């Protein structure tokens, strides 16, 4: 790995020291994120080998630990345990199973549990539901898989006290507090080598084909489950299955559908989290020559794997457990940077003194902006903007043009304008406002104000998107900042990388800036490789073909989970020579590219914006892709000038001994 790439990877990860009542090193404790808090429950102390039922809480913003001390009159904590599961359901933490002391409380006598305990996150108290006996009640187990979806808790696999795998799946209704379903499993699943996840909340609108977890004749499944497992770590086998525990016991196998430039190695005690349309797989990778904590991402739309390259940070020290901080699009890896990973793994020890924070957005992994209103409401907003009779103010642009608008509508979403308007109330009548932007940028800004979305082709020109992000930063418009950042991610290519880099640097969008910088470095690396290839060619031909810009050998795909066209230069339809002036200008230019575009430059390049849940893009073959107004028209786009840019395993039934 080159030093340049190494330094870029290191920009995405930072190590911080936690403080407060830091949990001691634990074995088999559960870690669950709720909001901006991480809850660590139970586990076995490494120092004394005693199990605990302590609850530690970490504020993910301040990185300060506190230990929960219950009120004297509140219910006691559950029995000490380890290798249990804890899932989030609304305002409750749901704890199931695990290994604990037998009733005699002898450290030499252990047992597996089958109980369900609830922790109320609002009252900060424990609750023990009265569960009626059921034929679907699960067998006691530990080191199992558990996933919560809607109001169902699904428990599958795990081991008994003889270290035998339990080939059973059970479903618990968290509303009625009863076991409602059970069945047999044909495979062995456990926390040592598998993860389960429920993709019911994944946004499928961006997927060009039906999600792999849905039946062809069943468009919607209330409780789809997916299980990824890896085993035989010397020659790793990777399995991916999907099934519906409530409707069918049949597992659909998707193992052969997974692909990627490289695939995950065998990860021990893996964990899985969902963010956007990706499943994040993390775990410990150990070989005689390599030991580190790995983070991988599976694109659920096309089942392509990519590695999240965190540089050299996670290659040193002992990093043991990762959790997703979804609200901030970041991944937290806990450990101790001064300890040895192999030694801690042999004791199954998890440390909480240090945390490595990985910026996932820099790899194109993030939650897409959600719609705030229906498409018909967005269209109605555009219609209002295009109706001069509803205007009571005139917006004057810096290129001498005007746009009639309604001040009440603008004031609802633009607080700065509302304050300016309140100062002029003593002067009723038609008003005018000078806006220091060009007409195309001003119109795109007003289209956002009226629709709360970026939905027109006008708004998705790269130059206009850059100015919209700057305006969002200047006027503190969080919604516009979110939408513009997302749109810039989608149109990030070699051609737009320098402009996106500069705009993100000006507006403090660090993740977008790092991603754009990676594209530029990859472009420069590609150009250098092309030059070397030309020099090493002993018999050059007059008309020589050079490697295609979208050649996989040119760009390592582990840097992004977006389509290769976004970062690998896939948008070139022809092969380019090393003397390509466009690439040379890109890799060497330091000039400003975020100035307000002139109309002539704006309309010569019309990208095809990527449709996402946050934008319903009008894609028409006719030139003006937004409604015309009666007072002032956007210059027409000549058809011959419009060019598109790509946006965006079996073994004996013997378990693992702990």
Regions found by a protein language model. Give the residues of each.
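N-terminal BTB/POZ boundary and linker segment
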Residues: 352, 359-405, 451-463, 551, ...
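Conserved blade-ending motifs and adjacent loop-strand segments that build the rim/top face
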Residues: 183-193, 252-270, 301-327, 372-379
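Beta-propeller and closely related beta-sheet repeat lectin domains
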Residues: 24-31, 42, 79-86, 139-146, ...
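A short helix->beta-strand "capping" segment at the edge of beta-propeller domains
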Residues: 2-23, 69, 130, 255
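Glycine-centered tight turns/hairpins at beta-strand boundaries that repeat
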Residues: 34-52, 90-109, 149-164, 184, ...
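Beta-propeller blade signature
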Residues: 52-64, 107-125, 166-178, 236-249, ...
